[in-house]
């Protein structure tokens, strides 16, 4: 589910809860990508849907009764303690659509952020003096999603990520989305 109004997110969470309760094969949880993202890295997301991550949003994001919830957010737009609150409620938190610095990522990982959504895309890149989000993903051992269609990420970057992180820290991402 990409960035949308909170009522749409609430309905999606309820639908996933019902599907898991009904033992629908293959449904194990929900990935909510946004709307707590950096507008400068919006990608396909509509920045008009972006919101502040407040207590009511934390309550909603942690409301799935069955299965797992994965939330992608931009760590630099989350107030201190918000990531820790989500993690304490069982939510898996991943960074994406972000201008986070390496230091932002260290703080977020310290609060329990454990992943990176679509490594290399819509995030700060690895530089010699500013490792950025990509550098943090590598250095901090964060599980990283990777779109391997050779359109989103160059084949050489895919190989470099695999060599740097290994199979245990990478997951394949389809980036499936409705036609736009």
Positions of the model-derived regions?
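Conserved strand-turn element in the central/C-terminal portion of the radical SAM core barrel
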Residues: 1-6, 147-149
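Short, well-ordered beta-to-alpha junction loops that form the rim of enzyme active sites
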Residues: 2, 35, 176
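Histidine/acidic-residue-rich, glycine-tolerant segments that coordinate divalent metal ions
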Residues: 5-131
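Active-site-adjacent C-terminal substructures of enzyme catalytic domains
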Residues: 104-180
């Amino acid at each position: 589910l990409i960035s949308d109004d909170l009522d749409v997110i609430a309905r999606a969470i309820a639908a996933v809860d019902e599907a898991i309760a009904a033992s629908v094969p293959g449904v194990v949880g929900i990935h909510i990508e946004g709307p707590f993202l950096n507008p400068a890295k919006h990608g396909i997301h509509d920045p008009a849907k972006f919101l502040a991550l407040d207590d009511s949003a934390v309550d909603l994001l942690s409301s799935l009764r069955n299965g797992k919830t994965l939330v992608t957010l931009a760590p630099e737009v989350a107030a201190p303690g918000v990531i820790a609150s989500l993690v304490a409620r069982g939510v898996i938190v991943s960074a994406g659509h972000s201008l986070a610095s390496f230091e932002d990522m260290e703080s977020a990982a310290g609060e329990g952020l454990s992943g990176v959504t679509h490594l290399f895309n819509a995030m700060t890149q690895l530089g010699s003096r500013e490792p950025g989000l990509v550098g943090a993903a590598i250095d901090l051992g964060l599980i990283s999603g990777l779109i391997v269609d050779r359109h989103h990420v160059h084949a050489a970057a895919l190989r470099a990520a695999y060599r740097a992180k290994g199979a245990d820290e990478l997951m394949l991402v389809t980036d499936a989305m409705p036609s736009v």
